[in-house]
Amino acid sequence: MLDVRYIRENLELVETRLKTRGTGIDLERFRQLDSQRRELLQQTETLKALRNKVSEEISRVKDKSQAQDRIAEMREVSQRVKGLDEELKGVEEALEYFLLTVPNIPSSATPVGASEADNVEIRVWGEKPHLDFTPKPHWEIGEDLDILDFERGAKLTGARFTLYKGLGARLERALVNFMLDLHTGRHNYLEMLPPFMVNRESMTGTGQLPKFEDDLFHLGEVDYFLIPTAEVPVTNIHRGEILKGSELPLCYTAYTPCFRKEAGSYGKDTRGLIRQHQFNKVELVKFVHPGHSYAELDKLLDNAEEVLRLLKLPYRVVELCTGDIGFSAARTFDIEVWLPGQDCYREISSCSNFEDFQARRASIRFREDEKAKPEFVHTLNGSGLAVGRTVVAILENYQQQDGSVVIPEALRPYMGGAEKIG
């Protein structure tokens, strides 16, 4: 959520920067609500001061019968204050809802562009495999090896659900453990295992609500939501808290299943594991000092990249332009892994700095010391990695001409020493 004072004092800048997203801000609506709120606050404070003055005068009168006019005046003022308080509450709720629907301002370092076509390639790592045969897409490999069953997954639930079998299930589990061990060991993240359902406040804190409710799986009876990413519960761990500045940065990692309707993806990636309603992901989340947040973003991005380097999977890093970054993000880098069976790079991680946007929504603050005024932290997150898409990358990059798949060396201890599937 953007700061009201910042918008008020930088109206043209806010409007200009948000237009680079392809969205905008209804400045007239903002001015109206902000002006109403400030006017009502002033009226309320004036009347409360008058009420306090009259009350003090009444307290000095020994014979209360001589103060009936003043008592009546105080009651009248109190009724007017009550009415103004109710009106102010309505205006503040309208202003808050308005602010909750306004996206974050892109960082000045974020490249300006209209769509993913304007994203900027930052670096490329690794060599694409040189295959002496026509590479197959992962869905064919998985079915041929009998480790992915798309037909039964659809039978159990519906489209975009998959049944992992045998070494396919073990490969998925091995990747989760490998990623968590790397991030908790070498990268010093604290592992969390959060609930897979969250309340409305949590979804609002990270920016999914109120704007994207139609994209979420909602459990109406209890007003809970299935999480679309571990970012939601893990970021909200510190919702409404004031952290110690000496403890920052706080670095958490979590494995969770993720649930997404994928409402806008009809007809896209209808085969395979790329776009599922349920998938597993290992997430990285940081709560950091505002002055260090972009240095911490570089570290988080490298932590996610290291998973691919250790698995020897070729990838590239792309910086998203203003027209392609997410609602809550100020700056985002995507890691895209090479998939020879599809002859393209596909996103496997998205690493973002939200600056104080989420912290302001979720009221996550810190104090430099005990006497300091609380400030909002900066929040960061990234996939470390999407597990199903890592399975895809292994199947396609390590496929052999005889139909088998070599298991990356770094993963073999997690696969009982097995060197290949098939």
Swiss-Prot record:
Enzyme Commission (EC) number: 6.1.1.11
Enzyme class, UniProt record, top EC level: ligase
Catalyzed reactions: tRNA(Ser) + L-serine + ATP = L-seryl-tRNA(Ser) + AMP + diphosphate + H(+); tRNA(Sec) + L-serine + ATP = L-seryl-tRNA(Sec) + AMP + diphosphate + H(+)
Main location: cytoplasm
Subcellular location: Cytoplasm
Alphabetized UniProt keyword annotations: Aminoacyl-tRNA synthetase, ATP-binding, Cytoplasm, Ligase, Nucleotide-binding, Protein biosynthesis
Gene Ontology biological process: selenocysteine biosynthetic process; seryl-tRNA aminoacylation
Binding residues annotated for ATP, in chain numbering: 260-262, 347-350
Domain of life: Bacteria
Key word Protein biosynthesis present: yes
GO molecular function annotations of the record: ATP binding; serine-tRNA ligase activity
Binding locations of L-serine: 229-231, 283, 383
Record-level GO cellular component terms: cytoplasm
Keyword field contains tRNA-binding: no
Classification via SUPFAM superfamilies: Class II aaRS and biotin synthetases, tRNA-binding arm
UniProt pathway: Aminoacyl-tRNA biosynthesis; selenocysteinyl-tRNA(Sec) biosynthesis; L-seryl-tRNA(Sec) from L-serine and tRNA(Sec): step 1/1
CDD domains attached to this UniProt entry: SerRS_core (cd00770)
NCBIfam families: serS
Domain notes from UniProt: Consists of two distinct domains, a catalytic core and a N-terminal extension that is involved in tRNA binding.
PANTHER family in the cross-refs: SERINE--TRNA LIGASE (PTHR43697:SF1), SERYL-TRNA SYNTHETASE (PTHR43697)
Job of this protein: Catalyzes the attachment of serine to tRNA(Ser). Is also able to aminoacylate tRNA(Sec) with serine, to form the misacylated tRNA L-seryl-tRNA(Sec), which will be further converted into selenocysteinyl-tRNA(Sec).
Family the entry assigns: Belongs to the class-II aminoacyl-tRNA synthetase family. Type-1 seryl-tRNA synthetase subfamily.
Subunit field text: Homodimer. The tRNA molecule binds across the dimer.
Full protein name: Serine--tRNA ligase
Species this chain originates from: Geotalea daltonii (strain DSM 22248 / JCM 15807 / FRC-32)
